[in-house]
Each structure stands twice: as C-alpha cells, then as structure tokens.
C-alpha cells in the first residue's frame, strides 16, 4: 500500500460527471428523508447531545471526520478488497464494518447503514473515487445535526 499511488484507493475525482449526479441526487433524496427523520425524538436527542457548538463547527468537524471515514471504508477497504475479490463482494464486504460502526446510534439509522454503505460503495466504484460518498455522507451528518439542534428548519 505504501508504494502505491493514492488514486488507486479512490483519492481522485474520477468520473466527476457521474459523481456530481450521484451527489446531487443523494443529497436531495436524503435531505427530504432527513427533514422528517432528524426531528424524531430519538434522532434529535442523540445528535443534539453530540453536536459541536455553532453551525460552522458542525460543518467543519463533520468534514474532517467524514473524510477519514470515507477514505477508510470506500477508499482503502473497497478498492483494496476489489483487487482481490472483485467489485461486487468488495461493495458488500466494506459495508459490513461500516454498519457495525453505527451500532449505538438510533435504531433506524443503524438498520439502514448496511444499504447506505453498499450504496456508497457502489458510487465510489462507479466513479473511481471516494470523494462523492464523502460529500453525501458529510451532507447527511451535518444536515442531521443542524436539524436536530434546531439551527435550521
């Protein structure tokens, strides 16, 4: 890994047109769902307790956290596993530990992450980049926190 180029692990723009379409569709679709889901008492309570002070800090700190998450799951794990096993198994295998990392979060979120992780894996594989899952995931987390804390909506 250390002698390989970072773009082999999705650290590149890849197919940016497809990535942009997935990002816009993913953010719009999840924005609509989260408009209601993030206000559920369980979600609101969970994220309100964990949100940093101020909208700017929420957005910045979530960007840093999600960059690391997406590089780990969709960068290293997905592209690394795909070399050995092919893209189909790699997409599902990288989604499993991703889902386990959501244990302890609100139940509805935990149950949906296996499919969300697989969707992020598919987008990363299709575009050749983990940047687009990062943008969607960053939006999801930040939008959820901003809604849950009453900073928007």
Language model features with spans:
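Membrane-helix interface segments
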Residues: 15-20, 51-55, 84-92, 106-107, ...
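Juxtamembrane helix-loop-helix connectors linking adjacent transmembrane helices
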Residues: 2-71, 83
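Membrane-embedded alpha-helical segments of multi-pass membrane proteins
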Residues: 55-60, 68, 72, 111-119, ...
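Functionally important transmembrane alpha-helices
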Residues: 88, 92-95, 109-153
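Membrane-interface helix caps and helix-loop-helix hairpins in membrane proteins
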Residues: 4, 100-108
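Small-polar-interrupted transmembrane alpha-helices in polytopic inner-membrane proteins
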Residues: 26-31, 87-102, 138
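Short juxtamembrane and helix-loop transition motifs at transmembrane-helix boundaries
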Residues: 51-55, 68-78, 94-102
């Amino acid at each position: 890994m250390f002698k390989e180029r970072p773009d082999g692990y999705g650290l590149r723009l890849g197919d940016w047109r497809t990535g942009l379409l997935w990002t816009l569709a993913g953010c719009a679709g999840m924005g609509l769902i989260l408009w209601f889901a993030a206000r559920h008492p369980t979600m609101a309570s969970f994220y309100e307790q964990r949100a940093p002070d101020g909208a700017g800090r929420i957005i910045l700190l979530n960007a840093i956290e999600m960059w690391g998450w997406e590089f780990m799951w969709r960068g290293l794990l997905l592209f690394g596993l795909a070399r050995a096993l092919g893209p189909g198994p790699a997409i599902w295998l990288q989604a499993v530990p991703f889902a386990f990392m959501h244990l302890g979060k609100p139940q509805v979120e935990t149950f949906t992450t296996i499919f969300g992780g697989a969707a992020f894996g598919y987008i990363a594989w299709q575009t050749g980049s983990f940047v687009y899952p990062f943008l969607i995931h960053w939006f999801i987390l930040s939008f959820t926190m901003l809604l849950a804390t009453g900073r928007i909506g």
